[in-house]
Amino acid sequence: SSTETPPSYNQLNYNENLLRFFNSKPVTAPVELDPPKVESSYVSSARGEDARSTLSPVQGFEGSGGSGSSGNFTTGSNLHMSSVTNTSNAGTGTSGTGNSGDGGGGGGADGPGSGAAPPVTLTESLLNKHNDEMEKFMLKKHRESRGRSGEKNKKSANDAMKMLEYSGPGPGHGHGIKRGGSHSWEGEANKPKQQLTLNTGGGGGGMPPFLDIQHTSSSTQNKGLAGVGVGGAGGGVVGVGSSAGGNGSGTGNNNGNGNNNQPTTNQFTQSGLSCTQNINLWPPFSVGITTPTSVLSSHTAVAQSSFSPQHSLFPTFYYIPASIAASSPSGTSPNPNRPHKHAHVHSSSEKPSTSQAAAATMPLQYMTGVMYPHPSLFYTHPAAAAATAMV
């Protein structure tokens, strides 16, 4: 901005000059500053010719002679003295005496001047002084406006640079957030994203959401699901357990009134594990809590007459024939019209788990022709495992 030529005073003051001129309601110039009298006499002579057509030749000649002075008068004060102008024109046409026109013009011109305040005499030095002062003022205002706009541009550029620095690639930037549960197959302890569920008491056949907690042990032979029992027509969630190849008894009770009495959040303190009742939101491969092989965790399998179907990411259904159902742990069902949620014990044929013996004592039964939901695609169904073991 220092190298460019500053604008002139007329350029800076152009709009203000226009506004000031039209707001002042400008008056016409006095008689001394009129345009040349040739135009005024030409206009007035044209008017005289119009009037002469209706008069005698002598009157018309006199009218045209008097129209010269009246023409000067009309152009001089046509704004302030419009009424006088009309009357003088009429008088010029009829009487043809220019003296009456001159008299009216003189009176009209003196009237506004005497009534107004005496104007200040404008000399050349006064005008130059005013122009110098106004030029300094306008240049100062121009510099301030340019400075403000320059500061705004500079600030916006700095903000843009800061935004680029914050969002640009760097340590911790430009990469996805590292998610827990992405290394469950590497045997590390992970924290999958889970949603904490509240205890729901089912009154009148309420079905609380089924809780599925999976545990991946470090030995591939002992993979298990935590069996979650759900209360009957008046009950809620009963018990939660983990399976890592051990035996034990589950905790939890079911009141017939629909009250849901559960143990505290720490379900596995007896086996050295701390786990909360959560719903896994990730696929089964990324979900897992690694349990040490030295810890024997209890497997709880408590099933009631009804259950809420599990909504897994990959729903898979299996048809259980009657022959395999006969080989499964049998028992009497209180309500044969409803399917059962069974505790799935995943164990290899070489090392049967003691949890199967515990599950055999439970009143569980595979119904013939009933579709049983399976938690995921990555585990073998216990009925299929039993069939292969028998073969």
From Swiss-Prot:
One of its GO terms (biological process) is entrainment of circadian clock by photoperiod. The keyword Cell division does not apply. InterPro entries: Period_circadian_regulator. Phosphorylated with a circadian rhythmicity, probably by the double-time protein (dbt). Phosphorylation could be implicated in the stability of per monomer and in the formation of heterodimer per-tim. Residues 27-121, 163-188, 241-270, 328-357 are annotated as: Disordered. Residues 93-114, 241-255 have a biased composition (Gly residues). GO terms for cellular component: nucleus; perinuclear region of cytoplasm. GO terms for molecular function: transcription cis-regulatory region binding; transcription corepressor binding. Keywords: Biological rhythms, Cytoplasm, Nucleus, Phosphoprotein, Repeat. It is found in: Nucleus; Cytoplasm, Perinuclear region. Its main location: nucleus. Forms a heterodimer with timeless (TIM); the complex then translocates into the nucleus. Essential for biological clock functions. Determines the period length of circadian and ultradian rhythms; an increase in PER dosage leads to shortened circadian rhythms and a decrease leads to lengthened circadian rhythms. Essential for the circadian rhythmicity of locomotor activity, eclosion behavior, and for the rhythmic component of the male courtship song that originates in the thoracic nervous system. The biological cycle depends on the rhythmic formation and nuclear localization of the TIM-PER complex. Light induces the degradation of TIM, which promotes elimination of PER. This is Period circadian protein. It comes from Drosophila insularis (Fruit fly). The gene is per.
